Each structure stands twice: as structure tokens, then as C-alpha cells.
């Protein structure tokens, strides 16, 4: 039996809804999912627990301002990107952060793990990792400095694939992963962006071997998601051919 992990969820998007659906039946939620406008905070029971902030990065300012001041140290930021300057400017640099490798179905029906590559750091790291595990997402607890490097890698992942997709007329990631020509361009993009990385943050520039290691890890993650997509597509096709409900 999965251990119950009491957390508060903020954000009703795909990830927030999927986490609520996974944790709610196990008693792992403390109060309702808090929505935009702060709706639901008055129903959250008192006490210290992680507050998983599942809003988009564009809504962070609003979500933090709506959070009761006494609960802000418990915030767990689930967004990608280099948030450190933004957090420090608001006195939130000591909060927990989570770096998620997963895919969420439209409507928040389910989450697909990205190979256990998700990472968590900060005061609520252990409980957050357990909550993610209860939802089927493997994660590891890492030191703050290591998290900064991993967060940069995830930001790089997003940047290179969006850039290449735009350059190829909006080609989906699954198509890029299967195209040898696209993979060659990806390696070039990664090397170019790593070369201009600020040395001061990590103390050195990434080596070419690290570039290739990172690229292979990223491709393995994408291939795992793409294989699930193809499997689901096959199930839908069989149901349609058999006259079953799709």
C-alpha cells in the first residue's frame, strides 16, 4: 500500500489535475486544489506541509501573491527554467524546487513518467518525492548545486527542441527524434548553446563529451514518450477497426 503523503496542490492545469486524481483517492491531499484567484485557500486545513505549485511560469507572480504569507516557505516550485533570480528577489530562494520529466495527457487524465529523471531539492524534497512517487513519477533528491545544473539541462532541452521544431515548420518532437538529419542539427545546437554558457555559475564550460551525454539522455527520454504515444495510437486504431469504442 502506498504511503499517504499529505500535500496541498495549487493549479488546475494538466499536471495539477493529474496529481490530484492520483493522490486524492489515497488520502494524500490536504484540502481542495487551489485555483486561480486563490479559490480554495480558505478550505485548506492548518499545519505545515508542501504546497505543490503546479501553475504555469507566467502565473507565478499571481499564485505567490495569493498564497497566505505564512505558507510561502512551504511552496514547491514545479516550473522549468532559471528561477533563482526571481525567487531570490522575493525572498523565496530557500523554497523547494522540483524538476519534472513527465508528460501529462490533455485534461489531466494521467501522467507518464519520463524514466525516473525528475529531481527535487529543498526542505520539502523528501515528502515531494514521495508524493510524486505515489502518482507514478520517479524522482530523486539532489543537493541544491546539482539541481542548478540539472535545471539548466532541462532548460536547454526545451530550447533546442522548440528551436529545431520551429525551424522545421513546426515538426513534432516525435518526428524529430526519428530523423537522423534532425539529430545531427540537435547536436550542433546543443554544442552552440553550451559554448556560451556563463562559466561563473558552474565554474567551467561543459565539455563536448558532456554535450553528447546530455543529448543521448534527452533523446532516450523523448523516445520513451514517443513509444508510449505509438502504443496508445495502436490501441486506438485496433478499437476503431474492431468497431469498439474509441
Identify what each model region corresponds to.
Residues 4-5, 42, 187-246:
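NAD(P)-dependent Rossmann-like dehydrogenase/reductase catalytic/cofactor-binding core
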Residues 1-4, 26:
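Eukaryotic N-terminal low-complexity, Ser/Thr- and Lys/Arg-rich leader segments
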Residues 29-35:
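Short beta-strand "acidic-cap" motif of Rossmann-like dinucleotide-binding folds
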Residues 77-154, 160:
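Rossmann-fold dinucleotide-binding core
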Residues 147-194:
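Active-site-proximal catalytic alpha-helix in oxidoreductases
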Residues 7-11:
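Conserved N-terminal Rossmann-fold NAD(P)-binding element of oxidoreductases
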Residues 12-24, 36-113:
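Rossmann-like NAD(P)(H) cofactor-binding subdomain of soluble oxidoreductases
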Residues 103-117, 169-178, 227-237:
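Helix-loop-beta segment of a Rossmann-like dinucleotide-binding subdomain
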Amino acid at each position: 500500500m502506498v504511503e499517504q503523503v499529505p500535500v496541498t496542490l495549487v493549479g488546475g492545469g494538466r499536471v495539477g489535475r493529474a496529481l490530484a486524481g492520483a493522490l486524492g483517492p489515497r488520502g494524500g491531499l490536504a484540502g481542495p486544489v487551489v485555483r486561480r484567484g486563490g479559490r480554495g485557500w480558505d478550505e485548506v486545513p492548518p499545519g505545515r506541509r508542501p504546497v505543490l505549485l503546479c501553475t504555469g511560469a507566467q502565473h507565478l507572480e499571481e499564485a505567490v501573491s495569493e498564497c497566505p504569507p505564512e505558507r510561502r516557505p512551504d511552496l514547491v516550485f514545479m516550473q522549468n527554467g532559471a528561477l533563482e533570480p526571481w525567487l531570490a528577489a522575493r525572498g523565496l530562494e530557500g523554497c523547494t524546487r522540483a524538476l519534472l520529466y513527465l508528460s501529462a495527457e490533455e485534461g489531466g487524465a494521467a501522467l507518464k513518467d519520463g524514466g525516473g529523471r525528475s529531481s527535487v531539492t529543498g526542505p520539502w524534497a523528501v515528502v515531494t518525492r514521495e508524493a510524486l512517487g505515489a502518482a507514478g513519477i520517479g524522482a530523486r533528491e539532489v543537493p541544491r548545486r546539482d539541481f542548478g545544473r540539472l535545471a539548466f539541462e532541462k532548460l536547454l532541452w526545451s530550447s533546442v527542441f522548440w528551436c529545431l521544431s520551429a525551424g522545421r515548420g513546426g515538426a513534432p518532437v516525435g518526428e524529430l527524434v526519428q530523423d537522423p538529419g534532425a539529430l545531427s542539427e540537435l547536436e550542433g545546437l546543443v554544442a552552440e548553446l553550451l559554448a556560451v554558457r556563463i562559466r561563473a555559475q558552474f565554474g567551467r564550460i561543459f565539455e563536448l563529451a558532456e554535450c553528447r551525454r546530455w543529448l543521448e539522455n534527452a533523446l532516450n527520454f523523448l523516445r520513451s514518450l514517443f513509444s508510449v504515444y505509438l502504443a496508445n495510437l495502436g490501441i486506438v486504431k485496433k478499437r476503431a477497426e474492431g468497431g469498439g469504442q474509441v
